[in-house]
């Protein structure tokens, strides 16, 4: 789960961790930007004090029961690899399980960061139209990264499909030209697991409310 900047200070971070755990999350990432934050691939990002961020990481580590805590740093753009590595080490000391160096711009930067963080689980962000070149999962693995996210890819594909749909609707007055690009009703129901919900619904016993006032009848 993307925990943004933790939604506040240490106590807010602790609350966030418990809420995410109760919702079933297995991991959360927290970043070191200041509000109002920006996409990691934009310019003029403002960073939190490294020790303030470390305090948030420590709060997350203290509050969690099992949640995996990933500390993200956006420092490479303004403080270089040296700054990003220094922050990452501080966050690890505070209790982070893994490090996410955001918006590295070359394979050399990815390799150098990994070289200077031996044995540390690292996460890479592969977002299209950003500052990071295209790399595959296996290429990231070869550079020393155990985890990769594609956080906006499905949204971009879905938005493009919606643009095409509404353009066709405006042009044709109907959706007939787009039917072959849609899920069928059967495919949709399979995707959302409708049969499982129907079975669950059928298995629930109807509630039977007591009639009258049985306590009063027994006392009589």
Spans of features found by a protein language model:
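Flexible C-terminal active-site loop/helix
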Residues: 169-220
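Alpha/beta enzyme core
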Residues: 1-150, 156-167, 197, 204-218
């Amino acid at each position: 789960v993307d925990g943004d900047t933790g939604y506040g200070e240490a106590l807010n971070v602790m609350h966030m961790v418990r809420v995410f755990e109760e919702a079933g999350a297995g991991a959360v990432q927290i970043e070191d930007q200041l509000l109002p934050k920006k996409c990691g691939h934009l310019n003029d990002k403002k960073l939190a004090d490294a020790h303030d961020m470390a305090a948030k990481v420590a709060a997350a580590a203290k509050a969690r029961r099992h949640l995996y805590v990933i500390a993200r740093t956006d420092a490479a753009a303004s403080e270089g690899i040296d700054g990003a590595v220094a922050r990452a080490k501080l966050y690890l000391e505070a209790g982070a399980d893994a490090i996410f160096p955001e918006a590295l711009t070359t394979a050399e930067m990815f390799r150098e960061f990994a070289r200077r963080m031996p044995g540390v689980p690292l996460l890479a962000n592969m977002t299209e139209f950003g500052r990071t070149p295209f790399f595959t999962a296996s290429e990231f693995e070869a550079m020393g990264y155990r985890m990769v996210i594609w956080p906006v890819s499905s949204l971009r594909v879905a938005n493009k499909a919606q643009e095409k749909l509404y353009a066709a609707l405006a042009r044709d007055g109907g959706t007939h030209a787009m039917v072959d690009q849609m899920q069928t009703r059967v495919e949709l129901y399979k995707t959302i697991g409708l049969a499982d919900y129907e079975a669950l619904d059928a298995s629930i016993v109807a509630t039977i409310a007591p009639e009258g006032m049985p306590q009063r009848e027994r006392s009589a």
